[in-house]
């Protein structure tokens, strides 16, 4: 059976072979039919041969590959340096001949590579320059469209070609039909959606008949990659060679590969281990979720990226993990930190640290924000490394040299030192050689560049990176800079090139003897082969591999093992063969069989690029313009022979010759003036639009400047060079010009010295350097050698000495009368200055003088015409006296200079504004200060003006205003504000003194307060007023007035020192009232003062920011004092037990009697969570209800203590801060007070009122105000649900009645529960006093310092006791823990008592005896939920099963029906949500009943 199958298989194979042969013949027939269409535009005259150049050495493999590429779409795979560009140039030239109207495109991935290929191709084959062009993205689209239409050979990047193809879809400007050949360099990039693939697809869609030639040294990592390249580029033929091929081996230069393994030092191992420990938790979570498998030591960044991609794909398909977001976050953390680990191992600690630097916007890496241990590790390593080498610049200075770098820089890895040793040894042995260092990242390139700069001039490194955007310390290069760097490297200006991957592919850098691979990026052999291919191109080379021990070393081994395997397997790979393009056009008519014709090809002579030539013509024109303007004018006139008479005259007249004495006299005059009149008159040519007077003024000014200056003979170097280059100018005058311009000679000499030190070849000089060289050669010709030039450089400039003497003794000082006479002659007949004359400086001087004069006049008028001033020594003496008169002032003056008031500003200043123009200081002091800083300064005149004003303050009149008296709370320390510098910007407290003898208690309402100390004000006022002897009486009166005015402020200091030790004397409101009374008394006592309104007093008493802060501090102390236990509280509690049913008026009386000595001015609601409110070390004080009653009574009948004194203190002043301003009750508040106990608001309205209320406190419900039971603050949410609402008869205590009035005190929101009340019902019977509640309160009342008080009504309604298992009372807010609980014998729901704890009797094993109804049933932390069934359940076993309980309830209800008692309808089930603040960490407790 098997044999029969084998025979059948052989027959099948034979049949298939015959079918394929027939199919191929049919395909050939179709090709010949379509040959005419494919060869459209073919030149029949050139079809019999194809040209191969013989001016270069013949290589058989190149000729074979060219012949194959002419007729098939070919992929050429050759090792680097074996002439792939030569093959491409020969194929391009033959298609250029065959298709005279066809177009050829050569594409390379980078711009430097494109520029290199166009020059190499033109050297190999003679492509005419008029038909060849290089296209870049810098050219505009319209310009490129014109080039596509007019040129034939294009060198461009694939991105530009694809862009023009897409642009041509609507306009059809791209010549799709004319494209006959496309050459693709570095073809291994043609994968995915790269531009190579897109260009081929676009062209194939429009034109199927074109030739494709692809070039690469490494077509792919795997066979699948090579097959993808073949499919994307429509390849039908492969031409593959490797290093050991027979026809290639003679042309291969030997490359020595040397591997240097660098071991990790301890300084890297320790941070590496710490980083692995930081990664471990995130990696373990991925493994526990079964997302990733592996060990933390073997995991790599690439494997994590692959697993993350797979996880995202599974999630997109509907297999979303429950912890998707957590897993994605762990992936991100692991990927980022493993990347940092690779940087640390391969590039060192410096690159590792810099990887975590913030971006350009200042945002730090998310891994640092998420993990604090990683942040600490990075900061520690950064501190250990020291200075960052990237902080030092490598740009050349003005002299052309790079500044030296420190030699002790730490680069963070041993690789850098090995690299230094390898390169220094190589270049010491081979000074004329060149080397390339390849790195993965730009940051490593920058570090290596700075490392090698330390060894100049042996090493002359240059960086070569891409054109990408700048990232951190790395930078990007432009195309022009890239080309210049490559040119310098090829010419030998720089001998070390430090490059990234941009230097790996295709660049022909000439003869490079050494390649250093600083790192191994991946196991892909493509990049490795590309790197080592930069050497050994023309002679033997050396490759040095620097690898770190461990994973990088293993990667290198894998690369070396696989680098030659791919190319050898290409030809036998079935995957690659199946991917070849079968419909390959021949592109040559079938009747032609072109033969190879070897021909000597002369390359086209190099022509300078048009842009450069255009730029040079512009420069040359600019350079020749001044020469044309200052040259000889003879060419502008026609030369005609002289007449006979003219000849006779010329022959009879001898030429004039100046005598030696005249020449000496002229030289002396010229040297003495050191200025040329020619230049003066040339520069002083006035415009035609100027009037004659303006022209004369300008000429006079220029003449004066020229007479007083020591300018060189010819100031402009361009003018000087034009004179020196003039052939008609005698040599002696040129020497004189050089003597008069030594700076120009010295500058040119220095530039030439620097240029000669650089050893730059003549053909590499730029325009500026060539200009310097030409100028220097001209100077040498004029000086007849270096000897005379050195004399000019060393000689003294006599003209400068004469000019200096003229400066010291000008002409108008030598003879004033003569100078005045000359000036009168010059100005005789001139008109006045025009409006547009250039006299800005003169105007400024006049304006300053006029402004100063007006200010002094104004001050003198206001001060009664008194002018006085004193020296700065006197002012310094006054300042020294001031410093020691006040301790507070001395502290203030010892602050930094930035806050010290300058001596020109005084506390009292004259205010030159009108009486009605006052600016408020509140809200505008910042703006006024900054505006004062921006004011125009008048220099020393302001100091003089301030001194004059300060000296004249003794003559203050009644209608004038005095500068501000700074007032600040004396208890606030080191509180300073910047003083206003300008006298015009003072916005002080205006003190009006009509008689000069009276006191002031009130001030203007528009006045403002400077935040300075009282003593400082007094001292400065005194020191300012004691400056003049003739004003002593006025000074004494003013001092007396100020002492009277400021006397309460001194008491305020004493009060502030006493307030700290006293806890129950905070009488803010009463002091405010007392202060107003005192002010009124003072106001009536001083009738001779200015009449100031009450509004002025209120405005003056407004507290400042510091006062408000002081009040807030005192409030905190008041809260503690307010909540201190009082000795009367026990007495009050006993009275409440006896008199609980008495009328409410008795409570008011009792509270008045008990609190008569208590301060009644407290307006701030107490903080029951204060630190000292319920300390267990203090005796038990009054309850909150008692204190509230006492406060309410004090408000109704205020009785200030007799010993209270009203002072002008910020503590006693009326509060005007809008954030804590007292307001009249709103309608909503009145409604709440009126409806208390009669219902409740809707939830939405209640929340709205709570949110929009300006007062942060809300009222407490009536049934929650008097509870001595401390409520446990908790963050837990307790849901209480009951099927039936209890009918509860409210019990009104004595202390609750006073809260019915509108003067109730608002309590903090945190003290209140949700104010939900059941509708009140009429009481039929007065309830009996429940002693169990008060007993329980006395026994279990909280004494903890952080616990608050709430009301009894809360727990009567909720019947809930929340306890805690914690025994550490310092960490919890609840001190009372209910250990046992019993039902109260009183017939009332919710009544309970707390008996002493009993010994637990374990009788659970006895089933025949009933369980006693004792406290053992209620364990710790139990909840007692109160409802109507509690009365029914009384006396029954709590442990009965639900069925028995239900049967019992049914029996009771049937019994009630028989007796005629109809049970009330059940109330709808309600869910009540309460949030109780707590400091414990317990979970949310939800209780549903």
Swiss-Prot record:
Residues 418-584 form the Helicase C-terminal domain. The keyword DNA-binding does not apply. Disruption phenotype: Increased incidence of spontaneous mitotic crossovers. Increased sensitivity to DNA damage caused by the cross linking agent nitrogen mustard mechlorethamine (HN2), the alkylating agent methyl methanesulfonate (MMS), and double-strand break inducing ionizing radiation (IR). Residues 591-647, 980-1000, 1145-1182, 1196-1222, 1255-1293, 1452-1489 are annotated as: Disordered. Residues 1480-1489 have a biased composition (Acidic residues). ATP binds at residues 78-85. GO terms for molecular function: 3'-5' DNA helicase activity; ATP binding; four-way junction DNA binding; four-way junction helicase activity; hydrolase activity. Residues 594-610, 1149-1161 have a biased composition (Basic and acidic residues). GO terms for biological process: DNA repair; double-strand break repair; double-strand break repair via synthesis-dependent strand annealing; homologous recombination; interstrand cross-link repair; negative regulation of mitotic recombination; recombinational repair. Pfam families: DEAD, Helicase_C. Residues 65-237 form the Helicase ATP-binding domain. CDD domains: DEXDc_FANCM (cd18033), FANCM_ID (cd12091). SMART domains: DEXDc, HELICc. Keywords: ATP-binding, DNA damage, DNA repair, Helicase, Hydrolase, Isomerase, Nucleotide-binding, Nucleus. A ssDNA-dependent ATPase with 3' to 5' helicase activity. Involved in multiple DNA-damage responses, some that require ATPase and helicase activity and some that are independent of these. Involved in DNA interstrand cross-link repair, probably together with Fancl and other Fanconi anemia pathway homologs. Independent of Fancl involved in DNA double strand break repair, including contributing to the synthesis-dependent strand annealing (SDSA) pathway. Probably contributes to SDSA by unwinding short duplex regions in complex D-loop-like DNA structures. Belongs to the DEAD box helicase family. DEAH subfamily. FANCM sub-subfamily. This is DEAD-box ATP-dependent DNA helicase Fancm. It comes from Drosophila melanogaster. The gene is Fancm.
């Amino acid at each position: 059976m098997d044999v029969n199958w084998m025979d059948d298989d052989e027959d099948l194979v034979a049949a298939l072979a015959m079918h394929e042969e027939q199919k191929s013949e049919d395909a050939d027939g179709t090709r010949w039919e379509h040959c005419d269409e494919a060869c459209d535009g073919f030149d029949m005259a050139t079809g019999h041969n194809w040209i191969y150049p013989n001016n270069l050495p013949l290589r058989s493999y190149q000729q074979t590959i060219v012949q194959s590429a002419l007729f098939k779409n070919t992929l050429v795979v050759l090792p680097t340096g074996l002439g792939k560009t030569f093959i491409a140039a020969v194929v391009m030239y033959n298609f250029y001949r065959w298709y005279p109207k066809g177009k050829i495109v050569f594409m390379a991935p980078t711009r430097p590579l494109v520029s290199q290929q166009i020059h190499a191709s033109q050297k190999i084959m003679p492509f005419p320059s008029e038909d060849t062009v290089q296209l870049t993205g810098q050219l505009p689209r319209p310009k490129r469209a014109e080039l596509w239409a007019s040129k034939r050979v294009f060198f461009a990047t694939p991105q530009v070609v694809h862009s023009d193809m897409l642009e041509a879809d609507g306009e059809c400007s791209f010549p799709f039909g004319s494209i006959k050949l496309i050459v693709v360099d570095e073809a291994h990039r043609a994968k995915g959606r790269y531009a190579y693939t897109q260009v081929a697809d676009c062209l194939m869609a429009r034109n199927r008949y074109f030739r494709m030639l692809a070039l690469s040294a490494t077509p792919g990592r795997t066979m699948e990659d090579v097959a993808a390249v073949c499919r994307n580029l429509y390849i039908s033929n492969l031409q593959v060679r490797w290093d050991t091929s027979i026809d290639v081996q003679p042309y291969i230069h030997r490359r020595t590969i040397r591997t240097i393994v660098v071991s990790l030092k301890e300084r890297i191992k320790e941070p590496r281990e710490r980083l692995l420990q930081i990664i471990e938790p995130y990696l373990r979570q991925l493994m526990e979720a079964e997302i990733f498998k592996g060990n933390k030591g073997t995991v790599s960044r690439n494997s994590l990226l692959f697993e993350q991609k797979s996880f995202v794909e599974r999630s997109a398909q509907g297999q979303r993990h429950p912890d998707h977001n957590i897993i994605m976050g762990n992936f991100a953390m692991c990927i980022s930190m493993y990347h940092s680990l690779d940087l640390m191992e391969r590039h060192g600690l410096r690159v590792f640290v810099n990887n975590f630097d913030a971006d350009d916007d200042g945002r730090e890496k998310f891994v640092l924000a998420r993990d604090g241990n990683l942040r600490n590790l990075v900061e520690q390593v950064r501190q250990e490394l020291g200075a960052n080498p990237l902080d030092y610049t490598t740009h050349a200075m003005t002299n052309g040299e790079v500044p030296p770098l420190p030699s002790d820089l730490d680069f963070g890895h041993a690789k850098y030192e090995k690299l230094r040793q390898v390169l220094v040894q190589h270049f010491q042995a081979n000074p004329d050689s060149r080397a390339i260092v390849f790195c993965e990242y730009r940051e490593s390139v920058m570090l290596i560049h700075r490392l090698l700069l330390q060894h100049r001039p042996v090493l002359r490194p240059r960086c070569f990176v891409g054109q990408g955007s700048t990232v951190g310390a790395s930078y990007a290069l432009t195309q022009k800079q890239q080309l210049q760097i490559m040119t310098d490297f090829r010419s030998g200006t720089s001998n070390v090139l430090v490059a990234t991957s941009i230097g790996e592919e295709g660049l022909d850098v000439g003869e490079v003897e050494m390649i250093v691979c600083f790192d191994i990026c991946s196991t892909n052999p493509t990049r490795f082969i590309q790197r080592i291919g930069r050497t050994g191109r023309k002679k033997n080379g050396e490759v040095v591999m620097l690898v770190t021990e461990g994973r990088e070393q293993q990667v290198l081994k894998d690369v070396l093992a696989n680098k030659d395997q791919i190319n050898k397997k290409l030809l036998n790979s079935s995957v690659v063969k199946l991917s070849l393009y079968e419909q390959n056009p021949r592109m040559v008519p079938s009747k032609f069989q072109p033969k190879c014709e070897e021909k000597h090809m002369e390359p086209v002579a190099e022509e300078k690029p048009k842009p450069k030539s255009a730029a040079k013509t512009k420069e040359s024109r600019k350079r020749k313009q001044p020469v044309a303007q200052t040259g000889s004018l003879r060419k502008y006139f026609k030369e005609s022979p002289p007449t006979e008479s003219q000849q006779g005259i010329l022959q009879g007249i001898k030429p004039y010759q100046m005598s030696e004495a005249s020449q000496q006299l002229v030289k002396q005059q010229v040297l003495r003036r050191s200025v040329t009149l020619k230049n003066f008159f040339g520069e002083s040519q006035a415009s035609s639009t100027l009037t004659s007077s303006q022209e004369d003024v300008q000429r006079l000014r220029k003449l004066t400047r020229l007479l007083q200056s020591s300018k060189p003979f010819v100031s402009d170097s361009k003018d000087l060079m034009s004179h020196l280059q003039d052939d008609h100018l005698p040599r002696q005058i040129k020497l004189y010009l050089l003597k008069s311009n030594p700076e120009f000679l010295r500058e040119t000499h220095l530039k030439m010295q620097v240029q000669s030190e650089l050893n730059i070849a003549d053909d590499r000089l730029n325009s500026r350097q060539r200009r310097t060289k030409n100028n220097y050669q001209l100077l040498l010709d004029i000086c007849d050698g270096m000897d005379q030039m050195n004399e000019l450089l060393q000689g003294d400039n006599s003209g400068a000495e004469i000019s200096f003497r003229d400066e010291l003794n000008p002409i108008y000082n030598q003879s004033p009368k003569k100078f005045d006479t000359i000036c009168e002659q010059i100005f005789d007949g001139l008109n006045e200055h025009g409006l547009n004359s250039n006299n800005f400086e003169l105007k400024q001087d006049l304006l300053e003088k006029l402004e100063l004069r007006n200010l002094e006049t104004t001050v003198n008028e206001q001060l009664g015409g008194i002018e006085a001033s004193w020296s700065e020594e006197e002012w310094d003496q006054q300042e020294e006296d001031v410093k020691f008169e006040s301790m507070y002032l001395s502290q203030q003056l010892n602050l930094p200079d930035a806050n010290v008031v300058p001596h020109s500003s005084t506390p009292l200043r004259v205010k030159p504004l009108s009486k009605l123009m006052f600016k408020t200081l509140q809200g505008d002091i910042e703006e006024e200060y900054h505006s004062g800083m921006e004011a125009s300064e008048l220099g020393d005149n302001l100091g003089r003006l301030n001194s004059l004003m300060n000296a004249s303050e003794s003559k203050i009149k009644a209608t004038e205003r005095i500068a501000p008296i700074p007032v600040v709370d004396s208890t606030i320390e080191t509180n300073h504000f910047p003083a206003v510098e300008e006298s015009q910007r003072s916005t002080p407290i205006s003190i009006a003194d009509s008689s000069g003898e009276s006191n002031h208690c009130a001030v203007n309402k528009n006045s403002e307060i400077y935040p300075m100390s009282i003593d400082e004000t007094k001292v400065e006022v005194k020191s300012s007023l004691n400056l003049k002897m003739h004003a002593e009486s006025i000074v004494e009166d003013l001092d007396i007035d100020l002492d009277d005015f400021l006397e309460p402020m001194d008491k305020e200091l004493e009060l502030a020192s006493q307030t700290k030790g006293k806890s129950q004397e905070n009488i803010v409101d009463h002091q405010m009232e007392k202060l107003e009374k005192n002010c009124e008394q003072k106001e009536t006592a001083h009738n001779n003062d200015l009449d100031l309104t009450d509004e002025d007093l209120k405005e003056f008493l407004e507290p400042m920011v510091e006062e408000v802060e002081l009040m807030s501090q005192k409030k905190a102390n008041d809260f503690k004092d307010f909540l201190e236990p009082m000795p009367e509280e026990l007495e009050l509690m006993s009275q409440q037990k006896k008199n609980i049913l008495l009328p409410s008026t008795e409570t008011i009386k009792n509270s008045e009697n008990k609190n008569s000595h208590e301060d009644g001015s407290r307006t701030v609601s107490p903080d029951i969570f204060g630190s000292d409110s319920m300390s267990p070390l203090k005796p038990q004080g009054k309850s909150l209800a008692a204190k509230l009653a006492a406060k309410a009574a004090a408000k109704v009948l205020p009785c200030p203590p007799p010993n209270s004194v009203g002072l002008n203190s910020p503590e006693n002043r009326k509060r005007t801060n809008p954030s804590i301003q007292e307001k009249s009750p709103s309608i909503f508040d009145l409604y709440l007070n009126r409806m208390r106990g009669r219902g409740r608001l809707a939830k939405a309205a209640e929340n709205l009122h709570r949110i929009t209320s300006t007062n942060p406190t809300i009222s407490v419900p009536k049934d929650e105000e008097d509870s001595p039971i401390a409520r446990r603050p908790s963050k837990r949410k307790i849901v209480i649900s009951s099927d039936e609402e209890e009918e509860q008869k409210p019990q009104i205590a004595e202390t609750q009645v006073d809260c019915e009035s509108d003067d109730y005190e608002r309590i903090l929101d945190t003290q209140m529960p949700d104010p939900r009340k059941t509708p009140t019902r009429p009481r039929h019977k007065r309830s009996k006093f429940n002693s169990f509640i008060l007993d329980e309160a006395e026994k279990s009342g909280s004494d903890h310092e952080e616990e608050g008080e709430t009301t009894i009504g809360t727990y009567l309604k909720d019947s809930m006791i929340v306890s805690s298992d914690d025994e550490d009372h310092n960490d919890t807010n609840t001190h009372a823990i209910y250990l046992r609980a019993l039902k109260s014998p009183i017939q009332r729901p919710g009544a309970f008592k707390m008996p002493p704890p009993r010994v637990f009797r374990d009788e659970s094993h006895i089933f025949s005896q009933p369980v006693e109804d004792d406290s053992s049933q209620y364990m710790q932390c139990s909840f007692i939920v109160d409802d109507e069934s509690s009365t029914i359940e009384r006396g029954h076993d709590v442990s009965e099963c639900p069925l028995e309980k239900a049967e019992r309830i049914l029996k009771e209800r049937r019994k009630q029906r028989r007796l005629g008692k109809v049970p009330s309808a059940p109330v709808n089930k309600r869910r009540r949500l309460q949030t109780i603040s707590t400091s414990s960490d317990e979970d949310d407790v939800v209780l549903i009943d």
